[in-house]
Amino acid sequence: MNKLITKLLFATIAMAGFTACSQDLIEEQKKNTKENPKHLTEFFATNSAKTRTGAKYVTIPSVLDGLLFYWNSGDQIWIDKDNNGVFVKNDGSDIQSGSKLEDANFFFNDQLNATSYKVRYTGNNSSAANEVTFAETQIQTAPNDASNIGKYGDCGVAVATKNAQGKYQFTLQHKAAYMVLSPYSTYGFASSVGVVAVYVTASKPISGKFAFDDNGVGEAKTGAKNTIAWFYKQELLGRKHISSSNSNFRDPQNMLPLPTAADVTQNGIIITMPPGTYEDLTIEYGLIDTATGGYGYYKQTFKNKTLVAGENRVLSRDIKLDTEFDPNEYYAWDAVQDEYYWKGAPNKLRVGRNMPSESTGYATSASDPRFQNEIPGGSTSNVADNAATRGATVAFNHNEALWLILNGEAKWDEWKMYVMNKHLYNGGIWIKTLKQIALERRVTVESLKEGFLGMDFRACPCTNNPHAKRTFNDADANYERPAKADRSKYMFMPAAGYFGRPTLASQQNLRIMLFCGDQGF
């Protein structure tokens, strides 16, 4: 097929929506030096910048400028030999295995004499002239590379005209649409964060078999789907399998980075799609962090977006997550406010899964304001004696915690992502707010602070509390994010883990991040 842009040059300008852009690539053209074999008719495909018609050209600075298509091994064309709507495939070409040509020769085992012939291209290794297949799975092996689009649905039409040398010359008009994604993040993620997959969902079919004629792509055929899955270098076994794409399975070279500004030369994602207007179009970026094991999907939606045949649409998206956890929020219990756990030793704050242990940098005695409050709580009937007096005064008290446990209707959300210390994490619970619980019970929030089911547990030793522990309701509904309409009733608490001792008795003087992504306190 004709290959789209091997290297797209992207403007440093950030584009908020779809913009028609294109780009001229400079690559040494491989010249065809073969003679026209006897008893064969030669069709010569030209792809020069002056005659190219498969893209829209612009000269505005800082915008993509032009498209360049290539012919690769496996490409073939069809011609309407007898002008009766019956197309025949070429019998040979000068495209060698591994070749990438701007111009190519196709040979037909016949002496053809008409002034012109209709030409169709329906993809690499195609089997029909009246049908094109848009691949449900598309794999890209380098940033901003489109060397495989012939396998994924690239197609085109032309009219080949006989020249003075007796050869038929044509320039293909491309009829597929090319969506070029360029995600970035002004947050400034660590280099271990990147994109490994993109899932595209539309309001009408975008993959499978489509009718094809001289006007281009037609209606979807039976079995066509509304989804396309794009992967970088290696295919995921399924959406949920992105959870295994962590440092144990994936080298950082096998993901596309998230620069701080849009730059397709670093991470251009090219997806071949049927042209048309899509009432709803959803793009989900599959993100991973090879340092922390964090993962999840970032969703972007569009309404009434049009993809034009033969043109690329560049979409640049600033990926911003709505939850950020401050790494300086780790405290020993009721330590002095602003005297967080690793204060004064920021190089020790290595947060994530499988992080090394630290033997120094944390408080070891009450003389250090970062040390925990050693006054035992919950041991007397005096509420004041059991109360936090320093940094933990803003924490939920015993009664409030019980209301959250018993009436918060907690829902575990594996896919909720958050950021901390420039890294990506996922996992946490949604739990109803005290305000919502009070509203449902027709009481005040203040009354929830003062007692639980008629008893003030701030003055009750924890050993006598029958409600101190509750098993999580393992129903499927509690592993789903609250419906969007109900989300304001909940608060999200990230499973940010905690710093504790390793399990070995010989390591009791060490501190290590435990249960990050699994537990939170």
Report each predicted region and the residues it spans.
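Conserved positions within compact, well-structured domain cores
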Residues: 216, 323-521
